[in-house]
């Protein structure tokens, strides 16, 4: 049941003195876009009459079919707390429609909605809890981003070591004011690194909340004279920033992943779900870890997974079964990072897990030892494989995975792969500072 009607939104906008509305949507690569309108145009927007040029976005449409429509999701109406309180600014997240009046198949929000519909057809609803990590750095005299921090804090430290504590508190309070429930917030391992953990929510709401959170975090950071970055590995020699995703599955109020008679408390559906994730993870990585820089995080020694395995407690594998305060069984995927488009990341992970349930894909046995301590022979015997080691490798794996290509749509995949291959080849052509320092004077 919808939370808001058109009439309710128009009334709220008038009562709250809203003068400006941002119609937001997300492009193929997870970048938030928006069209701004005045309150006088709000009724037109709510009647789905706002048009934009889709040909101006990479991977959308050609110039011959450029006109596209924004259809606001009424339940996403929210006032932006950091904007002026006289003449307020609100936002609506929108679905993208083509000129024929159809949901645009290459829109990432549409792709996620298709997977949600498939889950509902199987009788399932997802609850997802993300853990979003990011860095806060100082800005230069012109307000530009740097990679400098005077923060000396470590994991769970507090002030005065944690210099970002006030900014992080304001971020949490801002998100709460927008109706987003934050479970916890704290300083992470690296200097200047922070984490916000969100309460479980339905899949589409989770993706919307992640996009909103990134927008709000950057905005609040700027107000504190800081720059927030979700770059997976912004500095050499420190822990990178991830986006751990914990998936729960519900059917008619029942915890689908739970079975008290099992050694690990897991149902057969939970095992199959993990099996599906592990089967498709090499191609999934091109979506959940979408940057060249993503694979600088997925290296040994910094707490990020590089091995395809699962455990009920061990944090070194790709998947673990976390302890939850509410007793609901969850499956945590540890490889994604916050550079990912959340709509696409959730879509491919959910679809892969559902494929595992449908195909009854049984995962290998759990690994409760630190995988880095195992020999190659031991890993092979335990069926432990590696995640892709680069964006180029992950994109090649996505190309080969017919199931994921079907989930995303071949037209979308072709555009996405073309862009990511171009990004990878551009990187390969670069001569880095490391190479110059290593070789210039002695070769």
Q: What is the predicted role of each segment?
A:
Residues 1-184, 206, 226, 381-443:
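ATP/Mg2+-dependent ligation/transfer catalytic cores
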Residues 27, 97-103, 160, 200-206, ...:
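A generic structural motif
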Residues 81-89, 125-127, 185-190, 238, ...:
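Short glycine/proline-enriched loop/turn "hinge" motifs that connect secondary-structure elements
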Residues 88-95, 191-198, 242-246, 328-330:
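Glycine-rich, often proline-containing surface loops adjacent to acidic residues and nearby aromatics
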Residues 132, 136, 188-196:
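Short, conserved phosphate-binding/catalytic loop or strand-edge motifs used
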Residues 148-158, 191-206, 235-240, 252-257:
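Active-site-proximal beta-alpha loop/turn segments in soluble metabolic enzymes
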Residues 206-209, 218, 225-234:
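Gly/Pro-rich turn-and-neighbor structural signature
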Residues 212, 219-222, 226-227, 251-443:
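Catalytic-core signal marking the mid-to-C-terminal active-site face
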């Amino acid at each position: 049941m919808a939370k808001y009607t058109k009439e309710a939104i128009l009334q709220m906008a008038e009562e709250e003195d809203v003068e400006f509305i941002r119609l937001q949507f997300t492009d193929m690569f997870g970048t938030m876009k928006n069209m701004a309108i005045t309150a006088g145009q709000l009724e037109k927007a709510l009647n789905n009459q706002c048009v934009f040029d889709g040909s101006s976005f990479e991977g959308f449409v050609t110039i011959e079919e450029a006109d596209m429509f924004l259809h606001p999701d009424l339940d996403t109406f929210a006032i932006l707390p950091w904007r002026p309180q006289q003449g307020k600014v609100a936002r609506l997240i929108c679905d993208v429609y083509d000129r024929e009046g159809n949901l645009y198949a290459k829109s990432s929000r549409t792709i996620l909605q298709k997977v949600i519909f498939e889950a509902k057809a199987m009788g399932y609803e997802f609850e997802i809890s993300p853990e979003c990590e990011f860095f806060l750095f100082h800005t230069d005299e012109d307000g530009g981003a740097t990679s400098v921090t005077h923060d000396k804090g470590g994991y769970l430290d507090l002030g005065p070591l944690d210099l970002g504590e006030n900014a992080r508190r304001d971020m949490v309070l801002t998100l709460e004011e927008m109706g987003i429930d934050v479970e916890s917030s704290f300083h992470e391992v690296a200097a200047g690194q922070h984490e916000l953990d969100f309460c479980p929510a339905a899949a589409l709401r989770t993706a919307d909340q992640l996009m909103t959170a990134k927008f709000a975090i950057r905005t609040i950071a700027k107000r504190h004279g800081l720059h927030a970055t979700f770059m997976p590995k912004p500095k050499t020699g420190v822990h990178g920033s991830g986006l751990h995703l914990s998936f729960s599955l519900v059917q008619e109020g029942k915890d689908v992943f739970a079975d008290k008679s099992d050694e690990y408390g897991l149902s057969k559906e939970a095992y199959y779900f993990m099996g599906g994730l592990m089967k498709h993870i090499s191609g999934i990585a091109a979506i959940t870890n979408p940057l060249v820089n993503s694979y600088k995080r997925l290296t040994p020694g910094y707490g990020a997974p590089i091995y395809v395995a699962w455990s009920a407690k061990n944090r070194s594998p790709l998947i673990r079964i976390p302890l939850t305060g509410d007793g609901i069984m969850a499956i945590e995927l540890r490889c994604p990072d916050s550079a990912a488009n959340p709509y696409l990341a959730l879509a491919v992970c959910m679809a892969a897990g559902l494929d595992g349930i449908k195909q009854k894909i049984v995962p290998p046995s759990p690994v409760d030892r630190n995988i880095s301590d195992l020999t190659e022979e031991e890993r092979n015997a335990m069926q432990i494989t590696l995640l892709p080691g680069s964006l180029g490798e992950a994109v090649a794996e996505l190309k080969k995975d017919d199931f994921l290509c079907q989930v995303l749509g071949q037209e979308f995949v072709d555009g996405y792969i073309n862009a990511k291959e171009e990004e990878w080849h551009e990187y390969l052509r670069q001569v880095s500072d490391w190479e110059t320092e290593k070789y210039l004077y002695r070769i």
